[in-house]
Structure formats: structure tokens, C-alpha cells
A protein has these predicted regions:
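Catalytic Walker B motif of ABC-type/P-loop ATPase nucleotide-binding domains
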Residues: 200-204
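Conserved ABC ATPase "signature" region
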Residues: 154-171
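Conserved ABC ATPase signature
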Residues: 175-179, 183
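Helix-to-loop junction immediately C-terminal to a conserved catalytic motif
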Residues: 99
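The feature captures the beta-strand-to-loop junction immediately N-terminal to the Walker
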Residues: 84-86
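ABC ATPase C-loop
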Residues: 192-193
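Conserved ABC transporter NBD signature motif
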Residues: 107-121
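Conserved beta-strand-loop-alpha-helix hinge in the C-terminal portion
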Residues: 8-31, 252-259
Length: 259
């Protein structure tokens, strides 16, 4: 393994040596942990946090294929929920239905206990997809963050703070397409945070990010949850789940099943 820093090879490790690195060294180098951990249990029905977002008997079929069937879930306020499962299990389909970008076959989605039509969900929920190349519409990073904001000194100050936190301030005048893959991911998440919407759905937000930036995102998601936001994260990222998620929903353990 080669460890690169500032465009140079800073170290070289045999697999065994990498596994033996102290955890403090791994963190200091901004790397992912090479060790397996334990994922969280499924959500507890005893969680007393108020459910902002719910599904009731939600089903989705594509032609004759059952994507999921009769799914009833609760996503509590102030919590980060991981949605996991194999590729093709229906995680992104579920997320797009929740935020009003796709239509369910049967069932209802409720916000604050009331049935919410797709148009309402599109206003209430911010969806950050897994293809960042299709999500940016302006000529600069700063403009992207402020796209739907009322331009005030307060909003511009918040934008500056967020860009600095996400390591993007020096690129504020750059076109989003000029960013690296990881920088685009951070910008997309920054836009979600800046949106002010109280329900965020993030699809693979840390895929391909190094340990340092994964932990940055995890800490920010925990902070947003503490402020009262309801956050859903579609992810295969074990470390992200362990770092910030309160509960786990697993899609596709059996055909059409969500746990």
C-alpha cells in the first residue's frame, strides 16, 4: 500500500504492517480503519422520539417485480437512520418515493402524522443523490450553496462558515465541475445542510471518501440530528454507520422485505 500526502508518496506499507498501525496513527493520517467493526441493531420499537416521517403499508412493484411490499417504518426526529442492503435491493427507490421523486404502487407516506402528497414531500425533504455530477446548476461553488437562499449578510456568513468547515472555501469561485469527486460529495452534503429542510435523505454520501472526510461528514450529521433534523443515510459504509447512525433499516434481506 502506498500512502500519498500532498501529491507525494509519504510511506509504503505491507498489508500486515498496515493492520498493525496504531489507531491514533490511522486517524492522524486521515485513513479508514482497516479493521472490521460491528454494525448497529435494527431500530427499536421502544424509541420514544417523535416520528416526523412515516410509511404505512408502502409497496412498490416495477412491472411484475416486487421491489418491497407492505413496508411500515418510522423515522424519528433528531436521529440518523442508516438504510442498508445489497445493490439493487431497492434502497434508492425507497428514498426517491419518500421524497416525492418516484411513485409508490400502494401505501402512504406521512409527515407529522398527516398524509403527505408528493408535492408536499418535495418541499419538506431534501434529497442528495449518489450521482453528484447531475446535481449542480450554477457557475461557482459559492453560488451553488446560495442557490435557493435569500441573499443576506447572515446567509452569506453561514455559507462561508460551511464552506470552510467542509474544506471548500478556497474553491468558492471555482465551477463545481472542476472539483474532485470527493469535493463534489462534500459540496452536495453542504447544500443539503444549508437548505434548512428538516428532513434530509443522503444517498451514499461518503462513498469513496477518505477517513478524515468521512469523519467530518459523520460529525456534521450528528450535529444536525441534535438540532432536531431527521436524517436518512443510504450507505454501505460500515464506519459511517458506526460513527453517526442511531438505527439501521435493512432493505432486501428477502425479496420485497424491509426490516
Amino acid at each position: 500500500f502506498l500512502y500519498l500526502r500532498d501529491g507525494r508518496i509519504a510511506a509504503e506499507y505491507a498489508p500486515r504492517d498496515l493492520l498493525l498501525l496504531p489507531e491514533t496513527d490511522v486517524l492522524g493520517m486521515g485513513l479508514r480503519s482497516p479493521h472490521e467493526g460491528k454494525c448497529l441493531p435494527a431500530p427499536s420499537v421502544l424509541d420514544e422520539s417523535p416520528a416526523v416521517l412515516k410509511t404505512a403499508g408502502l409497496s412498490k412493484r416495477i412491472r411484475k417485480e416486487v421491489v418491497f411490499d407492505d413496508v411500515s417504518l418510522s423515522f424519528p426526529e433528531g436521529k440518523v437512520t442508516a438504510i442498508t442492503g445489497q445493490n439493487g435491493a431497492g434502497k434508492t427507490t425507497l428514498a426517491q418515493i419518500l421524497c416525492g421523486l418516484a411513485k409508490q404502487t400502494r401505501g402512504h407516506i406521512l409527515i407529522d402524522g398527516k398524509k403527505a402528497r408528493a408535492a408536499v414531500r418535495r418541499r419538506e425533504i431534501y434529497y442528495c443523490g449518489n450521482d453528484t455530477s447531475t446535481q449542480f446548476f450554477t457557475a461557482s461553488v459559492a453560488e451553488e450553496l446560495l442557490l435557493n437562499a435569500k441573499l443576506t449578510e447572515e446567509s452569506k456568513g453561514r455559507a462561508r462558515h460551511l464552506l470552510k468547515e467542509f474544506g471548500l472555501y478556497e474553491y468558492r469561485d471555482a465551477h463545481p465541475s472542476a472539483l474532485s469527486g470527493g469535493q463534489k460529495q462534500r459540496l452536495a452534503i453542504a447544500c443539503a445542510v444549508f437548505s434548512g429542510r428538516r428532513i434530509l435523505i443522503l444517498d451514499e454520501p461518503t462513498s469513496g471518501l477518505d477517513g478524515q472526510n468521512m469523519r467530518l461528514i459523520a460529525e456534521r450529521l450528528k450535529s444536525e440530528a441534535r438540532s432536531g433534523r431527521t436524517i436518512l443515510v443510504i450507505t454501505h459504509d460500515r464506519e459511517l454507520i458506526e460513527s453517526c447512525c442511531d438505527t439501521v433499516v435493512e432493505v432486501g434481506t428477502k425479496p420485497g422485505e424491509v426490516q
